């Protein structure tokens, strides 16, 4: 299997996967709707330096990863903005295959590192650790609700 660069004709599959993944256990996000997820996905794809891929499995798209490449003084960083695997395809190694293919693809593009954010209390945290990602101890995410 190979990653396929995201194109607009993949939108419906990505939207389906996103809504299914984020409204199913363990997340069960009731605030995720098809409408607001569609706007969110569109916004991400319009981000400067956007680079997204879809992962086909069994004749259909079963996962995607969206991000952007940031060029820093000391190298190029791919920031994962969203990643999801179709809940019907989870626990089959698709996420790990997706990450391995993404890492190879990004290396060939001259990207030096991948960064992402997740919550410590989600299965995704342990998935990323299992795949070699480490917590940056001195970094914190800050927010202020207005």
Question: What do the PLM-derived regions correspond to, one by one?
Answer:
Residues 85, 91-104, 130:
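Conserved acetyl-CoA-binding loop-helix of GNAT-fold acetyltransferases
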Residues 80, 114-118:
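Conserved hydrophobic beta-strand within the GNAT/NAT acetyltransferase core sheet
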Residues 49-50, 64, 137-141:
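Short hydrophobic/aromatic beta-strand or adjacent loop that forms the aromatic wall/cage
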Residues 2, 19-41, 50:
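Conserved GNAT-fold acetyl-CoA-binding loop/helix
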Residues 96, 108, 112, 120-138, ...:
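Conserved active-site alpha-helix within GNAT-family acetyltransferase domains
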Residues 1-16:
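A short beta-loop-alpha structural element at the N-terminal edge
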Residues 70-80, 90, 136-139:
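A conserved beta-turn-beta hairpin within the catalytic core of GNAT-like acetyltransferases
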Residues 54, 60-69, 79, 84:
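Conserved beta-strand in the GNAT
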């Amino acid at each position: 299997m190979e990653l396929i660069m995201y194109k607009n004709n993949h939108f419906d599959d990505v939207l389906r996967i996103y809504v299914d993944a984020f409204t199913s256990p363990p997340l069960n996000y009731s605030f995720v709707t098809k409408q607001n997820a569609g706007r969110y996905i569109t916004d991400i794809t319009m981000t400067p330096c956007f680079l997204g891929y879809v992962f086909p499995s069994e004749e259909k798209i079963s996962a995607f990863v969206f991000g952007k490449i940031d060029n820093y003084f000391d190298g190029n960083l791919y920031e994962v903005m969203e990643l999801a695997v179709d809940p019907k395809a989870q626990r089959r190694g698709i996420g790990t295959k997706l990450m391995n293919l993404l890492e190879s693809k990004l290396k060939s593009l001259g990207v030096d590192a991948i960064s992402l954010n997740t919550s410590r209390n989600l299965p995704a945290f342990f998935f990323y650790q299992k795949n070699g990602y480490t917590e940056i101890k001195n970094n914190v995410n800050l927010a202020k609700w207005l």
